[in-house]
Structures are given as C-alpha cells and as structure tokens.
Design a protein with these regions (language model features):
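Amphipathic alpha-helical polymerization modules
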Residues: 1-140, 209-317
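Cysteine-poor, low-complexity segments in flexible/peripheral regions
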Residues: 139-222
Length: 317
C-alpha cells in the first residue's frame, strides 16, 4: 500500500497530539493528586466517589448533631445534679423538723426551705448560652416556671426537644420542665388516699406552710394536720428525687450512646476516606514513572518528526 506524504504527516501529527494529551493528563493527576478528575476518567469510580462524598457529608452532619446533643444533655445533667443536692438538703430539713423543736426553729427551717425553693425555681428556669430556656421544650423563648395564684405553674412547651444523632437514631436531648419537676416515676410513694404527690414546688409549699403553722399550745387536730402535711411533703420530695434521678439516668445512658456513636462515626469516616483515596487519588509512584516515560516518548516523537520533515519525501510536491 502506498502512503501519501500528507497521510504520513497526519499520522505523525496525530501521534504527537495523542502523546501530548496523555502526558498532560498525567501531569494533571500529579498537580491535583487525583486520578479521577473528570467523570470520563473512570465513570464507575466517579459514580462511587459521588456516593461516598454524600455519605461523608451525612456522617459529618450527624457528628455535628451529636456535638450539639451532647452539649444540651450535659448542661441539663449538670443542672439536675445540682437540683438533686438541693432537694436532698430540703428533705433533710423536713425530716429534722419532725423532732421536738419549737416554733422559732420551725420558722427558721421554713425560711431555709423558701430559699431552697427559690434556688430550685432558678435552676428550673435555667437558660443555655444563647438565652434559650432549657426546660421549656421547643418554646425556648418562654419562661417555663412562673409564680401563679396557686403556686408555681408550668407554662413552657409540652414537646421535648429531640435530635437525630445518626441515620436510624433520634433521642430526647432536653426534657420539658413539667416532666422533670412535676411528675413521679411508676414506683412513686403514694398518699393514704392512693394519690401521688409529685409536684416538687408544691411539696415544698406544703412543708413551708406546715412549718409556719404555730404548734406551741395548738390542739391535737392541728398537730395531726401539720404532721400529715409534713409526711406528704416528705413523700413528695422523695418522689421528686426519684423522678429526677430517672431523668439523669436516661441522660447518662444517652451520653454513653453518643460516645459510642461518635466512635462508630470516626471509624466510618476513616473507612470512607480510605475508599475515596483508593478510588480517586493518584498513585504517585506509577504516575511519576508514567509521566517521565510519556515525556521521553513525546520528546522522541518530536525529534523523529523534525528529522522526517527534513527528508526529501516531505519536500515533494
């Protein structure tokens, strides 16, 4: 088969152009550190990279969500821990008042309980660093506990704040105040009539009112009424302690779970990054070797082409 001068020229030029493209592509891989820069480089790998990028983005979002959840639960746990100490002190005062003490001592205990009530009310109305009420549910701009005509009333939201902390796990990260300070657990101590004294602030009010009732020279009916009230306050405070302990236990379990999910998330992050690297990152040894070989081959092609241009064949009309 006879080849025309133009065909030989075109074939050599095309070879050089293809060689340049391959060399430049390898250079791009070295410059970016990526083997797959465009989907056309490796369509299957590119599709897998997109899916893994999405998985990484989701994993990062859940990691951030767990950080916020942990902060919220840790703050609530801290407040409930302090509340437990105060309630325990109040219960101790109530028990102490059951002894043989005079009205002055009883009034002093009542004043102490008033101070503890104010302290607990302040804790129940705690805010986070952004001014959001912790125990108000989703109505974070509302003061959850206010002094009403009949005592402390709850006016916050009635839906606890939940957080999606993993693809298949959502948890309560902040309890509503009424569930914490005005409820009792299933095993609560009952009153003689079968009811349950569960409202923490009401229990304190019962004790305060009873302690402020003079007993020096009082009749038996009054003394019995005061004793019954103090027993009710005692049971109520015990119920509040149990209920808050239950909430704290739930928080503790969930905080441990958050730590476990964080560990899983870190493992997932490492696995995804490893797979992404295998799919798209440049193999430096192979790429550098290919780059040098392609450059040498291209230089040889240039030299050959230039030499051929000097031959008479290319000068023929």
């Amino acid at each position: 088969m006879r080849l025309s001068t133009s065909m030989i020229y075109q074939q050599n030029m095309q070879g050089i152009i293809n060689g340049q493209a391959t060399w430049q592509k390898t250079g791009e891989q070295l410059a970016t550190g990526k083997r797959v820069v465009n989907p056309s480089d490796d369509p299957i790998a590119a599709a897998n990279v997109i899916m893994l990028d999405q998985a990484q983005s989701e994993n990062s979002q859940y990691t951030l969500a767990r950080t916020f959840a942990k902060q919220s639960m840790s703050l609530e746990e801290s407040i409930l821990s302090k509340s437990t100490i105060t309630i325990t002190s109040a219960l101790s005062e109530v028990i102490k008042s059951g002894g043989t003490i005079n009205d002055d001592n009883r009034s002093s205990i009542a004043a102490s309980l008033r101070g503890m009530k104010a302290e607990l009310l302040n804790m129940a109305n705690s805010t986070d660093g952004n001014g959001n009420y912790i125990f108000a549910g989703y109505e974070t701009d509302k003061t959850p506990f206010v002094e009403g005509a009949s005592g402390i009333e709850y006016q916050g939201g009635y839906q606890a704040i939940s957080q999606q902390v993993d693809s298949s796990r959502s948890m309560t990260v902040s309890h509503i105040g009424s569930d914490v300070f005005m409820r009792a657990t299933g095993g609560a101590k009952t009153e003689p009539d079968g009811s349950v004294q569960a409202d923490l602030f009401e229990s304190l009010d019962i004790a305060i009112n009873a302690l402020e009732t003079p007993l020096d020279g009082a009749d038996d009916a009054t003394k019995e009424s005061v004793a019954a009230a103090m027993n009710t306050a005692n049971r109520g405070l015990n119920n509040s302690l149990s209920n808050i302990s239950s909430a704290r236990a739930e928080l503790g379990i969930q905080l441990n779970e958050i730590d476990n999910l964080d560990a899983i998330g870190k493992d997932r992050d490492v696995a995804n990054k490893t797979t992404l690297s295998q799919l798209q990152d440049t193999d430096w040894v192979e790429a550098i070797s290919s780059y040098m070989m392609q450059m040498s081959s291209l230089q040889a092609s240039y030299t050959t082409f230039q030499n051929m241009q000097g031959m008479s064949l290319f000068q023929m009309k």
